[in-house]
């Protein structure tokens, strides 16, 4: 996403400082990035007409307060997600309590988050208007636990969810290296056996 790209270009601290100290310059940079992203996404859809979605990663959202996000981020994300596609996917595995209630307004309908916030809490924060993708701890459970631990953690995560609609069970964030086949199979078994 535009905030993440700006942080790659400048450095995270430098970009966040620029937003506070010289907001006009930050907005100019974000406008250039957003225009580029819109052109890039359009080119992809024109080149591959079967593409019916947008997938953006932007963890910088998690380091902003609501007012700053509404000022610097929300208008740009609304522009980017206002495309003629069915799937509007956002990955943000940084803290997401601030952005979660704003996801429907952004146009997001599929969200992959970190594991610090429970799925039940995220359902409430999004008013169950966004399909959630997550959120088993990837490193400490999926990669490091044994198969019994993965099964138990997955079962506990799902048992804590009275409403399992709008949910794609996955790990929070991304798949870590070193996950054993046994752990993947335990995860799948726990999901299949969930009540």
Model regions: which residues?
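Active-site loop segments of alpha/beta catalytic cores
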Residues: 1-195
């Amino acid at each position: 996403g535009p905030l993440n790209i700006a942080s790659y270009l400048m450095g995270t601290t430098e970009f966040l400082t620029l937003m506070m100290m010289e907001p006009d310059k930050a907005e100019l940079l974000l406008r250039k990035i957003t225009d580029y992203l819109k052109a890039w996404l359009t080119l992809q859809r024109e080149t591959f007409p079967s593409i019916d979605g947008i997938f953006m990663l932007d963890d910088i959202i998690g380091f902003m307060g609501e007012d700053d996000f509404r000022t610097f981020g929300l208008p740009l994300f609304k522009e980017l997600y206002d495309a003629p596609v069915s799937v509007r996917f956002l990955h943000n595995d940084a803290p997401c309590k601030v952005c979660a209630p704003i996801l429907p307004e952004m146009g997001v309908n599929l969200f992959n988050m970190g594991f610090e916030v429970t799925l039940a809490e995220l359902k409430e924060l999004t008013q169950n208007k966004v399909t959630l993708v997550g959120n088993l701890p990837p490193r400490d459970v999926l990669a490091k636990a044994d198969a019994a631990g993965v099964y138990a953690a997955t079962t506990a995560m799902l048992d804590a969810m009275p409403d399992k609609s709008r949910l794609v069970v996955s790990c929070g964030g991304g798949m870590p290296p070193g996950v054993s086949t046994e752990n993947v199979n335990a995860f799948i078994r726990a999901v299949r056996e969930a009540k």
